[in-house]
């Protein structure tokens, strides 16, 4: 087996540019101009994609809220949707245990009743508590979020199925 083209720790890379000793002598200058330019382009693309993504996420969120109203589900939003992340809803479903809802929908829906960093804690959400939401409302609250790459129809179909479960669990 040939080892051509393999660089080991014993090989010294040759400089392309000469001058300072940044990056262990590989290149001169404090600022890696090519990397800065690349990062700038990446940020430009991310910003352009974000605007489209945010618009689509708001449409999904609005459709979910419309479905809740049409189905007559009792709910309260935790937080002002104008200031929330477009791809996340935190909703209190009156009379529905968030734990029961999570267990009943775990086959097709990834929802949570707290942050990932407190998933082993059974205490009420410290964020919702800080917002002044009563404990009984916190215990009926879930966070629904979705991300890029998930088809809108899949999100909405799963949400419709979740609404069916909510109606069955509501007291």
Features from the language model and the residues they span:
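Active-site PLP attachment segment
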Residues: 1-24, 28-41
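Short beta-strand-to-loop capping motifs
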Residues: 8, 91-95, 146-148
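Generic structural signal for well-ordered, non-membrane alpha-helical segments
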Residues: 28, 32-36, 50-61, 98, ...
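PLP-dependent enzyme catalytic core of the Aspartate aminotransferase-like
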Residues: 35, 124-171
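Structural signature of PLP-dependent enzymes
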Residues: 43-66, 76-85
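Hydrophobic C-terminal alpha-helix "anchor/cap" residues
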Residues: 68-69, 105
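Conserved C-terminal alpha-helix-loop-beta "cap" of PLP-dependent enzymes
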Residues: 89-142
